[in-house]
């Protein structure tokens, strides 16, 4: 008997990726976030498409077009709330996915890890240009502050900033091009996610123990399709109440006011998922230094495979490294909190200490912990 999914050229690829894929038998719920990110991406693309049908990317009508979507379009309020809060769930899954990769040593699949870091940067860029589109106060001033960082680049900075703006400040041309970027970038994210998956299936999934799982694998379907379906339900559990009952909980009240270049908000800050990076940017008094620290805080992920010193892949049996990992997680939460606070003492010094600890943990302490654990496990007789 010919089984269509095993012979048809297209179905065969899907079959090898999602049905007959051999998967380790012991992967935990931490491995659910990959599929959840895929689902988040689909939700964002679909809701975004329907929003784009009614949105106008002109400075004089952008704000009112968003109000029109919420008031006059059938279920427009729901589509917008799902899109805005779906972004928050997307980043929550993204951070947990990266955290799991660091904890269990998944970064040793270098190709998968590197394309993943590029994916993270692309998603961050997509979210940034998307936040500008409603053309509220925080949208406008957020765009002004972040794009102005380009002017910190020596020699070409000012020219580069004006090139991105399409003028001498954030204005109509900027909004139009940001809408174009926000429309095309999800397609690039989808393509890169496919490459990410392609590289992953070259090696197979890692597992909590970090040991080669080839001797004990099970088919992806039905075991992990059921597990991913449960993960989806648990994702919808916070997303739907958030979108239906308190959709503006994670937003900024300033964004309910139309953009006004003559009136600066008292505290300019991005969405919660960028606060850690914003805190790093603000913690350094020098403009160029802040920009470099901001870039380094994300790009440092690319060198994590080179800093792996342990004989064991996973942190599952490495208590010293585990402790440092959770200090790093707490440190990132501290940076997120600092990013939302005004630029005054004691927040400035807390932010500066947190950024020093962040780089110290990744570059020095965690590699040293790996070497120490190797030494402790060596037989001494």
From Swiss-Prot:
Question: What is one term from the GO cellular component aspect held by the record?
Answer: mitochondrial inner membrane
Listed InterPro entries: Cyt_b/b6_C (IPR005798), Cyt_b/b6_C_sf (IPR036150), Cyt_b/b6_N (IPR005797), Cytb/b6-like_sf (IPR027387), Cytochrome_b (IPR030689), Cytochrome_b_C_euk/bac (IPR048260), Cytochrome_b_N_euk/bac (IPR048259), Di-haem_cyt_TM (IPR016174)
Q: How does it sit in the membrane?
A: Multi-pass membrane protein
Chief localization class?
mitochondrion
In terms of superkingdom, the source organism counts as Eukaryota
Q: Would I find Kinase among this entry's keywords?
A: no
Other comments?
A: Heme 1 (or BL or b562) is low-potential and absorbs at about 562 nm, and heme 2 (or BH or b566) is high-potential and absorbs at about 566 nm.
Listed under subunit, the entry gives: The cytochrome bc1 complex contains 11 subunits: 3 respiratory subunits (MT-CYB, CYC1 and UQCRFS1), 2 core proteins (UQCRC1 and UQCRC2) and 6 low-molecular weight proteins (UQCRH/QCR6, UQCRB/QCR7, UQCRQ/QCR8, UQCR10/QCR9, UQCR11/QCR10 and a cleavage product of UQCRFS1). This cytochrome bc1 complex then forms a dimer.
| Name by which UniProt lists this protein | Cytochrome b
Tell me which species this is from. Answer: Thylacinus cynocephalus
Q: Lineage from the top down? A: Eukaryota, Metazoa, Chordata, Craniata, Vertebrata
